[in-house]
Design a protein with these regions (language model features):
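Catalytic grooves of carbohydrate-active enzymes
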Residues: 163-202
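Short histidine/acidic/glycine/proline-rich micro-motifs that form metal-
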Residues: 50-55, 78-81, 121, 142-145, ...
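Active-site beta->alpha N-cap acidic-glycine motif
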Residues: 1-83, 89, 96, 100-103, ...
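Domain-start "cap" segments at the beginnings of catalytic or binding domains
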Residues: 99-137
Length: 202
């Protein structure tokens, strides 16, 4: 898949033991505060790819994410599948989320803002239009925490097995993923912290 989709960030080339945790689909009050608590326990930093609708509903939690030293990034306003959405509608939805982020996050000129397409599904035309403005972030470790057929133990086992230095790991701060994520995240953090890894911002 990586070879078929050049021009996306799948992992970070790093020196030393560094990992990049990401959380998709929040923020929501039922789950995101738990994530922040676990990250704090291990002095870990993470990047949250937020749905704009949730940002608007729960801006107080988004502020907590920032205050805890983490980063907020764009995941569209309505969690759209690019393959099933028109070009104009998709770009407008990305911009709508970015407009909400701009009311929460202080502007910076250091790097491009980050965007992750929901489901990893985006057309070539959509990506080409977004790439001059955004860094398009994918992943090399998908925890599948949202999969109800996957046990929490197997979710953790598979996630650990696939992770290496520079990995971009996807968890979800969502109700759908809550069961597996609540089990896997603290144990994932403990495992790699004890191996000398640090968790950094994208």
């Amino acid at each position: 898949m990586k070879k078929l989709l050049p021009g996306y960030t799948w992992h970070r080339g790093v020196a030393g033991k560094k990992l990049f945790l990401t959380f998709d689909d929040g923020p929501i009050p039922e789950v995101t505060p738990f994530v922040l608590e676990q990250l704090a326990n291990y002095n870990a930093r993470a990047t949250f790819f937020c749905v704009g609708d949730n940002l608007e509903k729960h801006s107080d939690i988004a502020q907590q994410v920032l205050a805890s030293g983490h980063k907020l990034a764009n995941h569209t306003y309505n969690h759209l599948k690019g393959w099933q959405t028109s070009f104009d509608e998709y770009l407008q939805n990305v911009q709508q989320c970015q407009d909400i982020l701009a009311t929460i996050v202080s502007p910076t000129t250091e790097n491009k803002p980050l965007f992750r397409p929901p489901y990893g599904r985006i057309t070539t035309k959509q990506a080409t239009a977004l790439r001059p403005t955004y860094e398009l972030i994918m992943w090399d470790v998908l925890t599948n925490d949202y999969d109800a057929t996957l046990s929490p133990e197997e979710c953790l086992k598979q996630s650990i097995a696939k992770t290496q230095s520079g990995s971009i790991i996807v968890f979800h701060d969502s109700l759908k993923a809550e069961r597996n994520m609540r089990y896997a995240l603290p144990r994932f953090l403990e495992h790699f912290t004890h191996q000398g890894y640090t968790f950094e911002l994208l």
